[in-house]
């Protein structure tokens, strides 16, 4: 059994509007966060060239359906069925309680633009799937869209996302332990093929 998971394409754009190669790919999420602990950052989120919101927060996540059960979930984002054609924009610990996660069609282009606050810029970094952090400066931006590539997952057993959620989140009708078949024999088709460790 196989399924195709959507990915995100990320390009850093300089203040002159020129994209800085190479583009990067993320399976779960792209995070734009503060570089220093104890400081909040300011940034704009734009959707297809229109301002969505100005955030004063620890950062912002853009996640795929696959990533909705990862960092995005911890930040208060929604749970999304893996095959849904959407992306989620979720603020991390926003200063305003009215700032909530937004679910968008995956054909939209998202731009995250760092901002100064009272003439000062607090340094930020961005990362993909929690890997290496890359610095970003004021005047630069991240352009995020659905990638043309997908990631193929092979399951040796039929997967049930509802059962996975019940087990992982300990909902009623679920169990505190891993249900049989949860990620058993899961392979990623890519640069190498190897079983993922059971969780």
Residue ranges and their predicted role:
Residues 15, 19, 32, 48-51, ...:
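ATP/nucleoside-binding phosphotransfer catalytic cores, i.e., glycine-rich phosphate-binding loops
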Residues 12-14, 34-36, 64-68, 93-94, ...:
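Glycine-rich beta-alpha junction loops
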Residues 45, 67, 126:
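Short aromatic-centered micro-motifs
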Residues 4-6, 26, 39-41, 56-58, ...:
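A generic structural signal for well-ordered coil/turn residues at beta-strand boundaries
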């Amino acid at each position: 059994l196989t399924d195709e998971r959507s990915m995100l394409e990320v390009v850093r754009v300089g203040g002159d509007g020129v994209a800085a190669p190479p583009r990067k790919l993320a399976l779960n999420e792209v995070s734009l966060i503060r570089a220093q602990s104890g400081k909040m950052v300011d940034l704009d989120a734009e959707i297809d060239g229109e301002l969505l919101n100005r955030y004063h927060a620890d950062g912002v996540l853009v996640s795929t359906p696959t990533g909705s059960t990862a960092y995005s979930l911890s930040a208060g984002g929604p749970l999304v069925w893996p095959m849904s054609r959407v992306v989620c924009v979720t603020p991390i610990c926003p200063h305003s309680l009215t700032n909530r996660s937004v679910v968008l069609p995956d054909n939209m282009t998202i731009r995250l633009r760092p901002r100064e606050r009272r003439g000062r810029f607090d340094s930020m970094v961005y990362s993909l799937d929690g890997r290496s952090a890359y610095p970003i400066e004021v005047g630069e931006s991240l352009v995020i869209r659905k990638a043309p590539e997908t990631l193929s997952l092979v399951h040796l057993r039929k997967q049930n996302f509802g059962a996975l959620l019940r087990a992982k989140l300990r909902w009623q009708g679920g169990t505190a332990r891993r249900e049989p078949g949860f990620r058993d024999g899961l392979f990623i088709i890519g640069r190498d093929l190897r079983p993922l460790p059971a969780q």
